């Protein structure tokens, strides 16, 4: 309402407490602007004069001019608002019914189009036509009122007198919860799509495909699970007895034979995770079969053939190319000496190698006739000072058995490599 800061050039027409605004215009407190000034403001606006220029010419505050022009553009009226009390209600039952009728005929009609049509058909005039916001509120609260079905599923709504509810034709009716208690909150239940008996989803449905030939022959049982809409707790679990019982209830006797049902029971009673002790025993049995004598024989034959085919110039004539090595098993393999590698000295108390064995490995001019022995590799300053890394990888230097001191000539011979 424009009751404050109103410039009134004709203040004599409105006796009362008045004043002068910042533009020099005279106004009266609590009284609206005269209709003559209001009409002049609208005329200047139609002529294209800016609101700020209108305010200076008529010496009316800019806020007053903007409010009068805004109301005129919205309602087409230049009359002031009612002083005191509330303005008369424009959303009469007749107007609400017309708005509902327009919305029913054209659901996509905008509020400003409804307002123009109310004015064009003479339902309302410029003073009683509802605003755009009022029309939107009427459509939201009264015309498109949410549909609340009764508990008995009749779907009849009770409306206030004078108000009309527009039935929505765009969406199909939603089936009540009493007709479909399970699927009322599903997608089909929300959208109201009817479901036939053939398309009805089966809960806890399990399809088990078995091969009778494998069952009779003792082979593995092939199971293919197809779970459709399985709720929590109904999944078959090998550790849960309830899962076995619930699954057994769904398996019909006319579908599977007694032998197949017993095979299924054995599968379900078996734990889901293998036993630790059974797994270790299984691994030990596999390792025993892998390193048995029949399994090692082909590999040793390949080593013998490769050694016999190649010649090593470092060995000289002491090692012949046609030597054969017997196949040994168990602990005897530890005493077997292969050409090109230093011999393995057994621990104390297990015997030593004869001199002839050492003489066949290295030229005899570098060693004495005594049995060969060598100290631990820690007796030297650093192990990496050997130029030949093959010596460091030999099992001889990493043996845990204690050894006696070696002659200085033997150490010097290995240092020259």
Curated annotation (Swiss-Prot):
Keywords, ordered alphabetically: Developmental protein, Differentiation, Disease variant, DNA-binding, Nucleus, Paired box, Phosphoprotein, Transcription, Transcription regulation
Biased composition (Polar residues): 305-325
PANTHER family: PAIRED BOX PROTEIN PAX-2, PAIRED BOX PROTEIN PAX-6-RELATED-RELATED
Gene that encodes it: PAX2
DNA-binding segment(s): 16-142
Disease implication from the record: Papillorenal syndrome: An autosomal dominant disorder characterized by both ocular and renal anomalies, but may also include vesicoureteral reflux, high frequency hearing loss, central nervous system anomalies, and/or genital anomalies. Eye anomalies in this disorder consist of a wide and sometimes excavated dysplastic optic disk with the emergence of the retinal vessels from the periphery of the disk, designated optic nerve coloboma or 'morning glory' anomaly. Focal segmental glomerulosclerosis 7: A renal pathology defined by the presence of segmental sclerosis in glomeruli and resulting in proteinuria, reduced glomerular filtration rate and progressive decline in renal function. Renal insufficiency often progresses to end-stage renal disease, a highly morbid state requiring either dialysis therapy or kidney transplantation.
Cellular component, GO, one term: protein-DNA complex
Keyword Cell inner membrane listed: no
Originating species: Homo sapiens (Human)
Keyword Metal-binding included in the entry's annotation: no
Residue span of region Disordered: 304-325
Protein name per the record: Paired box protein Pax-2
InterPro entries recorded: Homeodomain-like_sf (IPR009057), PAIRED_DNA-bd_dom (IPR043182), Paired_dom (IPR001523), Pax2_C (IPR022130), PAX_fam (IPR043565), WH-like_DNA-bd_sf (IPR036388)
Expression across tissues: Expressed in primitive cells of the kidney, ureter, eye, ear and central nervous system.
UniProt subcellular location: Nucleus
Effect of residue 387 to N: Found in a patient with bilateral optic nerve colobomas; uncertain significance
């Amino acid at each position: 309402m424009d009751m404050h800061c109103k410039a009134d050039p004709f203040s004599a027409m409105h006796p009362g407490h008045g004043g002068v605004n910042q533009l020099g215009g005279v106004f009266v407190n609590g009284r609206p602007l005269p209709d003559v000034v209001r009409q002049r403001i609208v005329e200047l606006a139609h002529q294209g004069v800016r609101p700020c220029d209108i305010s200076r010419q008529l010496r009316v505050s800019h806020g007053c001019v903007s409010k009068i022009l805004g109301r005129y553009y919205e309602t087409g009226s230049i009359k002031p608002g009612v002083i005191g009390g509330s303005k008369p209600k424009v959303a009469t039952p007749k107007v609400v019914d017309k708005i509902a009728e327009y919305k029913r005929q054209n659901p996509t009609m905008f509020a400003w189009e409804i307002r123009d049509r109310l004015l064009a058909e003479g339902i309302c005039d410029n003073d009683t036509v509802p605003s755009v916001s009022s029309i939107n509120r009427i459509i939201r609260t009264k015309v498109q009122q949410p549909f609340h079905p009764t508990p008995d599923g009749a779907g009849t709504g009770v409306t206030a007198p004078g108000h009309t509810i527009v039935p929505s034709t765009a969406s199909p009716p939603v089936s009540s919860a009493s007709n479909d208690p399970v699927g009322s909150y599903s997608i089909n239940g929300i959208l109201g799509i009817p479901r036939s008996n053939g398309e009805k989803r089966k809960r806890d449905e399990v399809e088990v495909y078995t091969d009778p030939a494998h069952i009779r022959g003792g082979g593995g049982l092939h199971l293919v699970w197809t779970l459709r809409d399985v709720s929590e707790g109904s999944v078959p679990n090998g550790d849960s007895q309830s899962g076995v019982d619930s699954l057994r209830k769904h398996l019909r006797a006319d579908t599977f034979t007694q032998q197949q049902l017993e095979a299924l029971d054995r599968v379900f009673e078996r734990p889901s995770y293998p036993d630790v002790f059974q797994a270790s025993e299984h691994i030990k049995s596999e390792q025993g079969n892998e390193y048995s004598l029949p399994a090692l024989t082909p590999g040793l034959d390949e080593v013998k053939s490769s050694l016999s085919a190649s010649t090593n110039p470092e060995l000289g004539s002491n090692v012949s190319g046609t030597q054969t090595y017997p196949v040994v098993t168990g602990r005897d393999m530890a005493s077997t000496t292969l050409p090109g590698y230093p011999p393995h000295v057994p621990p104390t108390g297990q015997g030593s190698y004869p001199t002839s064995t050492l003489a066949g490995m290295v030229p005899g001019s570098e060693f004495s006739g005594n049995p060969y022995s060598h100290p631990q590799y820690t007796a030297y300053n650093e192990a990496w000072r050997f130029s030949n890394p093959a010596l460091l990888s030999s099992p001889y230097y990493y043996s845990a058995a204690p050894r006696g001191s070696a002659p200085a000539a033997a150490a010097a011979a290995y240092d020259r490599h």
